[in-house]
Swiss-Prot record:
GO biological process, one term: prolyl-tRNA aminoacylation
Name of the protein: Proline--tRNA ligase
Biological source species: Synechococcus sp. (strain WH7803)
CDD domains: ProRS-INS, ProRS_anticodon_short, ProRS_core_prok
GO molecular function: aminoacyl-tRNA deacylase activity; ATP binding; proline-tRNA ligase activity
Upper lineage: Bacteria, Bacillati, Cyanobacteriota, Cyanophyceae, Synechococcales
EC number: 6.1.1.15
Length: 594
């Protein structure tokens, strides 16, 4: 390919709407262009990158015996209603684009395809003799993001590989899950990415076990907690740790204390000589559920701990056997709307009476009471007395209403590791590029996808699902491989492997040697780009650095002697060598790395 025919338009200035380096560089380098909020066009070089990633993914999945398919992007609402996810995806998270056709039938644009693939499996997989089987597709997905940002990292339209496996028994599911994990490691390695597998929450997809694959990068939206021995890594949403040891509360009888202007734990401790580990704070929240219920919820945490909202949503869902659409703090305005008296915010205790909800209009008339283990493990503590400007010193759990024990706290860097208290957790940021799940029978039970087992009995299929964000992975590679001059693509996914730059297009000697080198690369099956533009050499060099081709061959003033300059993009090291040696150096490098 010649640059003069590539439709390459580069930018020197940083786009105003590009917040992170990878987004800035992909726009500046002529890889993507914004069409609308969260909607991008993949320009020719970006499409080459995506096709190379797709080829790597296909090779690894085909090696596992997976079968490629293509599923419809338009999905009937009926399937999602049967799985119980329609309301959550259209009202709760609200991430599914949905529409009504001319026959007034509800449809959704697929953000994922569990329902569709399960419906097909139930129709096609009738016997255990057909199992196991894994199907995958690579196609565009849609998410109605509240706040699209960071270019391809969080867009409203994106390319994804999603695979689904079906099994007759748990052992077989676990074997495929592990095989897929191994394949993912190879995929990310071949794409030139440093990725770490971490324990993760299953989220709206569901299932018993799941792992995320994170590309470590400062711009990552996720916080990863890891142990130094490499035995533990988890997304903070899922992570567990040993909390600091609580200081015992001084002996003494239970008593009321006046606490004016002490609505926070910090104020309470400062005014009364307390340590936060000696206190229990209570959050008053309202959970909105997919079955229509609105459940007032009291959450008790030790005073030094922070609430993990993902763990909370899971605990509420388990306790009430319903999916959580949203959980938010109860406000005074909401109390007025429910015809309820004002709550003593800032002084609420775990034993706030259900009578506080008496007469409410639409909420459940009792509290769901959840307590983190750090709070329940305190023998005596200070907490709100359910009266304005008053707290109770020396409370115990004995006289409290029953609490549902749950892990609700947020693990943090510096906490002791559960598996080895001598180690502490460290943190880094990551970009999620893949996620694998053991779904079990969640969807097959809901959609009645059954097979006949070896005993001749009907049984629901066991399932796994496995996703890779193709377009996100491409941008994550840039986030991990760039410098102040531009992108430095890993060799395996670079749009071109080498760029031959003619320093002075008016020099026939330079042009002839460059054309010879360019043709030699093409004849050797090497993806080469020839910069044949009538531009100053400095402009060409800047563009070459910006677009990030792994190898650059500059044909310049030494062309008459058959010499060229070889520049490796990742190191910026350059050498002047005979053109035959330059060709062989690039060829050998590509053969070694691919």
């Amino acid at each position: 390919m010649r640059v003069s025919r590539l439709m390459l338009v580069t930018l020197r200035d940083v786009p105003a709407d590009a917040e992170i380096p990878s987004h800035q560089l992909l726009v500046r380098g002529g890889y993507i262009r914004r069409i609308g909020s969260g909607i991008y066009a993949y320009l020719p070089m970006m499409w080459k990158v995506l096709r190379k990633i797709n080829a790597i993914v296909r090779a690894e999945l085909n090696h596992l015996g997976a079968l490629e398919t293509l599923l419809p992007q338009l999905q009937p609402a009926d399937l999602w209603e049967r799985s119980g996810r329609w309301q959550g995806y259209t009202e709760g998270e609200g991430i599914m684009f949905h529409l009504e056709d001319r026959q007034n039938r509800q449809l959704g644009l697929g953000p994922t395809h569990e329902e569709v693939i399960t419906e097909l499996a139930g129709d096609l997989l009738r016997s255990y003799r057909q199992l196991p089987v894994t199907l995958y597709q690579i196609q565009t997905k849609f998410r109605d993001e509240i706040r699209p940002r960071f270019g391809l990292m969080r867009g409203r339209e994106f390319i994804m590989k999603d695979a689904y496996s079906f099994h007759a028994n748990q052992e077989d599911l676990e074997n495929t899950y592990q095989a897929m994990a191994t394949a993912y490691a190879r995929i990310f390695e071949r794409c030139g990415l440093e990725a770490v597998a971490v324990d993760a929450d299953s989220g709206a997809i569901g299932g018993a076990a799941s792992q995320e694959y994170m590309v470590t990068a400062a711009a990552g939206e996720d916080l990863i907690l890891t142990s130094s021995d490499g035995l533990y890594a988890a997304n903070q949403e899922k992570a567990t740790s040993r909390p600091p040891v609580a200081l015992p509360l001084a002996a003494g009888e239970e008593r009321m204390i006046e606490t004016p202007d002490q609505s926070s734990i910090e104020q309470l401790c400062a005014a009364n000589g307390l340590d936060p580990t000696q206190t229990v704070k209570v959050l008053v929240l309202l959970a909105r559920l997919d079955d229509g219920r609105e459940q007032p919820t009291l959450v008790s945490l030790r005073g030094d701990q922070d609430l993990n909202e993902v763990k909370l949503a899971n605990a509420v869902s388990r306790s009430l056997n319903a999916a959580v659409l949203e959980i938010r703090p109860i406000s005074e305005n909401q109390l007025c709307q429910q015809d309820l008296s004002e709550f003593p915010f800032g002084a609420i205790g775990p034993d706030l009476s259900d009578t506080a909800l008496k007469g409410c209009r639409s909420w459940e008339n009792h509290f769901l009471r959840l307590a983190d283990a750090t709070a329940l493990d305190l023998p005596r503590f200070v907490c709100g007395a359910n009266s304005k400007d008053q707290h109770c010193w020396g409370r115990t759990w004995d006289a409290m209403p029953a609490q549902i024990k749950a892990d609700l706290r947020t693990a943090r860097a510096g906490d002791q590791c559960v598996h080895d208290p001598s180690q502490t957790l460290s943190e880094c940021r990551g970009i999620e590029v893949g996620h694998i799940f053991q779904l079990g029978r969640k969807y097959s039970e809901a959609l009645d996808a059954r097979f006949t087992n070896s005993a001749g009995q009907q049984e629901a299929l066991l399932m796994g699902c496995y996703g890779i964000g193709i377009s996100r992975l491409a941008q994550a590679a840039v986030e991990q491989h760039h410098d102040e001059a531009g992108i430095s693509w890993p060799l395996g996914i670079a749009p071109f492997q080498v760029i031959v730059v003619i320093a002075k297009i008016q020099d026939p000697t330079q042009v002839a040697l460059a054309e010879e080198l360019y043709q030699s690369f093409l004849d050797a099956g090497i993806d080469a780009l020839l910069d044949d533009r009538d531009e100053r050499a400095g402009v060409k060099f800047k563009d070459a650095d910006l677009i990030g081709i792994p190898w650059r061959i500059v044909v310049g003033r030494d062309a008459g002697e058959g010499k060229v300059e070889v520049v490796e993009r990742s190191t910026r090291c350059s050498t002047s060598v005979p053109h035959q040696e330059a060709f062989q150096q690039v060829k050998d490098s590509i053969s070694t790395h691919l």
